[in-house]
Regions:
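Short coil/turn segments at secondary-structure boundaries
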Residues: 10-12, 119-120
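General structural concept
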Residues: 13-20
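Active-site glycine/GP-rich loop and adjacent strand/helix microenvironment
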Residues: 65-297
Length: 297
């Protein structure tokens, strides 16, 4: 992040914050595989496509924190990926996925979309990174069969091969403020609807959708949450001397848009911090996932 008076935005993290972060990203990983209550599918042998910006960017914490809880393999390995360019990571990750298969994918909405298009290009032999006959012998038998079936199906349907033709993801997660712009396209490319997360430099990870993919719930152990109505936020921008009222989680109303205000727990440095993000309350309960707490988008 660059701009304003300071070239880099940084935020301090305590060990307790990192422990909470680890627990919550693990919960997100599990939830991303779920289609209904009590149905999960995560194994230590699963493979994870590395499509994240490395440290000091906040996304660089994800593989490190997850590695403390479960030994999922990243493609390519984190130690190698951090020293590669975006294009190099995509090409190597694709080649490794063809050999080992792929179970998970996580990235910022726009970045995930760019990676997906890059994989589609590689799948169809573009960019010099396509699957060559010489490398097929190194692939698992079921991946060779899947590739042959995908080529036949795509030829019959007269279309280009997509990532979903080769990889059957268990879980797909996206974060960022532009997710809504890419969700439909990402679902078409991968054959699975991405689960949206709320994360940022200052708060770490704060919220996630469930198997219903119908709004995010905030993690109660990450921060204390307050909300400013859109009307009051705009008035405050026009008149900086105006102090807007804040509302608590049990005071938000469905359909209303709010600016999020949070106080980081576990020794964080941000108290009643306004990050500028806006969220709409989409409901106070959801029968599908049996919740009675507000959810947002």
């Amino acid at each position: 992040w660059e701009g304003g008076k300071h070239p880099i935005k940084v935020a301090p993290y305590t060990r307790s914050m990192l422990d909470t972060y680890r627990n919550n990203v693990t919960a997100c990983l599990i939830l991303s595989t779920s289609k209904e209550k009590g149905s999960f599918d995560v194994a230590a042998t699963d493979k994870f496509l590395y499509a994240l910006a490395p440290l000091p960017f906040a996304t660089g914490l994800f593989p490190l924190a997850l590695g403390e809880e479960i030994g999922i393999e990243f493609l390519p390995a984190v130690k190698e990926a951090v020293n590669m360019s975006f294009s190099e990571r995509n090409k190597l990750g694709f080649k490794m996925a063809m050999k080992k298969d792929l179970g998970f994918f996580f990235g910022l909405g726009s970045v995930a979309y760019a990676v997906s298009l890059s994989l589609s290009s590689l799948t169809n032999g573009g960019g010099g990174g396509g699957v060559k006959l010489s490398s097929l012998m190194q692939c698992k038998p079921h991946m060779i069969l899947r590739l042959l079936q995908a080529k036949r199906r795509c030829k019959k349907e007269n279309r280009a091969m997509l990532p979903k033709d080769l990889f059957h993801l268990k879980g797909f997660m996206v974060a960022g403020t532009d997710n809504l712009c890419y969700k439909e396209d990402l679902e078409e490319l991968w054959g699975i609807r991405p689960m949206e997360l709320f994360a940022g430099t200052e708060p770490s990870i704060m919220g996630t959708e469930t198997w219903t993919r119908k709004g995010m719930y905030f993690f109660p152990d990450t921060a204390f949450y307050e909300f400013i109505t859109e009307k009051d936020m705009m008035r405050n921008y026009e008149d900086p001397s105006y102090i807007p009222s804040t509302y608590l989680m049990d005071e938000v109303r469905p359909g209303e848009k709010y600016e999020l205000v949070f106080t980081i727990l576990k020794g964080g440095a941000f108290a009643r911090y306004r990050c500028g993000d806006m969220y709409r309350c989409v409901g106070l309960e959801n029968r599908e996932d049996e919740t009675r707490i507000p959810r947002f988008e």
